[in-house]
From Swiss-Prot:
This is 3-isopropylmalate dehydratase large subunit 1. Binds 1 [4Fe-4S] cluster per subunit. It comes from the Bacteria. One of its GO terms (biological process) is L-leucine biosynthetic process. One of its GO terms (molecular function) is metal ion binding. InterPro entries: 3-IsopropMal_deHydase_lsu, Acnase/IPM_dHydase_lsu_aba_1/3, Acoase/IPM_deHydtase_lsu_aba, Aconitase_4Fe-4S_BS, Aconitase_4Fe-4S_dom, IPM_dehydratase_rel_enz, IPMI_cat. Heterodimer of LeuC and LeuD. NCBIfam families: leuC, PRK05478.1, PRK12466.1. It comes from Mannheimia succiniciproducens (strain KCTC 0769BP / MBEL55E). The lineage of its organism: Bacteria, Pseudomonadati, Pseudomonadota, Gammaproteobacteria, Pasteurellales. The gene is leuC1. It holds the Pfam family Aconitase.
Length: 475
């Protein structure tokens, strides 16, 4: 019988932040420690406050950051070229001044993609509950924080009250065992999981990841997994914090200092599921024989290993899945039985809140050093933040990228989504180190294949999808 006192890591976060239970259906009034907002999902929320003449409850708990619509042109300036983007960013700036909330604007040396900037600044700490107007807020689970995305009306309520009406999720534990083989990454792990359980396999769940694979991964690798957990439907993703996390956070601008650091560490070490905690669902995945993954369709779960081939929908039983596969192949312009390594590309994109960090760029440089991208391929590398960009330049990575023929640009969400200048044309096919491959995600009629950033680099050199293990040496 379950111990009445046993709790999962998710339960501990929710219980410690619950102000009041609202009913018997699992709805609670939840306190939010940190709010991170971008220029795209916040305007209506601020307009609502202004119309009602309300102020923001806790200004110091909020960060405003420009990332979705800003240009990533190599030479940075504060001007937008798109009228809609100009309107959004100017209104963002206006609200920052009106409500006295800190803003990382386009030319701020701390600017970047919100889910990269937050951990650089030490804004995402173990035990926190963090809400943002973006679904990939799950990224912060890599630090033992609970992050989740919210809509515009919720943002307005949160700004005014520091709270949200929240419905509790079910608990899922994903245990990842084995040692990652040569050439595989955290991106391959999460892509394999999404393919295994489906795009809705974790709907209404918070996932806790554990096991040898997680223990061995770097903090930035863990962020990739938590970031893409939302692609299988999860509304939250967790990993218990450990010494790697504490070392990563230590010394960041907003992290606790001195005696407060020691007190924080003592509390953070308690952040783990109880040994006898019961999960609503358990999944085990052995990663010992994992291969690099690619998507072939228009959903993140339509993916397989690079050595595979385009599936035949007619081999599936009649039903919705067969129809989905048929629609995906028609949109992607692919034929059943085609080897993945035969698929030619026109574009290669590396960046995003999933894979735009310094460790990702180091792996890309290993593939590109001494090589050139294929004729006819346009390659773009967008660092996840201005600080990542500076670090990559200091380490000599940027020169490798430029010498290989890639465009080395400024930070922002860029081509992860068609919301700024960086947009594909109809029929363009892109090897992409991002998180979503929906129809039109990178531009109307564009075709996106998700993979690790190193795999993108290899595809850019080859001119087609290819196994990155052919380009790098093992240990």
């Amino acid at each position: 019988m379950e111990n009445a006192m046993s709790k999962t890591l998710y339960d501990k976060h929710i219980d410690s932040h619950t102000i009041k239970e609202l009913d018997n259906e699992g709805n609670v009034l939840l306190y939010i420690d940190r709010t991170i907002l971008n220029e795209y999902t916040s305007p209506q929320a601020f307009s609502g406050l202004r119309e009602e003449n309300r102020d923001v409850w806790n200004k110091k708990s909020i960060l405003l950051n420009v990332d979705h619509v800003n240009p990533t042109r190599p030479v940075r300036d504060a001007n937008m070229t798109d009228p809609g983007g100009t309107l959004q960013v100017n209104y963002f700036r206006e609200n920052s001044k009106l409500f006295d909330i800190e803003l990382f604007d386009v030319t701020d040396p701390r600017q970047g993609i919100e889910h990269v900037v937050a951990h650089e600044q030490g804004l995402a700490l173990p035990g926190m509950v963090i809400a943002a107007g973006d679904s990939h807020t799950t990224t912060y689970g890599a630090f033992g924080a609970f992050g989740f995305g919210i809509g515009t009306s919720e943002i307005e309520h949160l700004l005014a009250t520091q709270t949200l009406v929240y419905k509790k999720l079910k608990n899922m534990r994903v245990t990842l065992t084995g040692k990652l083989p040569f050439g595989t990454t955290a991106k391959d792990v999460i892509m394999a999981l999404v393919a295994k359980i489906g795009a809705d396999g974790a709907t209404n769940y918070a996932i806790e990841f554990c096991g040898e694979v997680i223990d061995e991964l770097s903090v930035e690798g863990r962020m990739t997994i938590c970031n893409m957990a939302v692609e299988c439907g999860a509304r939250g993703a967790f990993m218990a914090p450990d010494e790697k996390v504490y070392e990563y956070i230590k010394g960041t601008p907003r992290a606790p200092k001195g005696e407060m650091w020691d007190l924080a560490i003592a509390e953070w070490r308690k952040l783990k599921s109880d040994n006898d905690a019961v999960f609503d669902k358990e999944i085990h995945m052995d990663c010992s024989d994992l291969e690099p993954f690619v998507t072939w369709g228009i959903s993140p779960d339509q993916a397989d290993v690079i050595s595979g081939e385009v599936p035949d929908p007619n081999l599936l039983p009649e039903g919705q899945k067969r129809k989905d596969y048929q629609a995906a192949l028609e949109y992607m312009g692919l034929e059943p039985g085609m080897k993945f390594e035969e698929i030619k590309i026109s574009h290669a994109f590396i960046g995003s809140c999933t894979n735009g960090r310094i460790e990702d760029l180091r792996e890309v440089a290993k593939v590109l050093k001494g090589r050139k991208i294929a004729q006819g391929v346009r390659g773009m590398i967008i660092p996840g933040s201005t600080q990542v960009r500076a670090r990559a330049e200091a380490e000599g990575l940027a020169k490798i990228f430029i010498d290989a023929g890639f465009e080395w640009r400024q930070s922002g969400c860029s081509m992860c989504l068609a919301m700024n200048e960086d947009v594909l044309s109809p029929g363009d096919r892109c090897a992409s180190g991002t998180n979503r491959n929906f129809a039109g995600r990178q531009g109307a009629g564009s075709r996106t294949h998700l993979m690790s950033p190193a795999m993108v680099a290899a595809a850019a050199v080859a001119g087609h999808l290819v196994d990155v293990r052919k380009f790098v040496e093992g240990d």
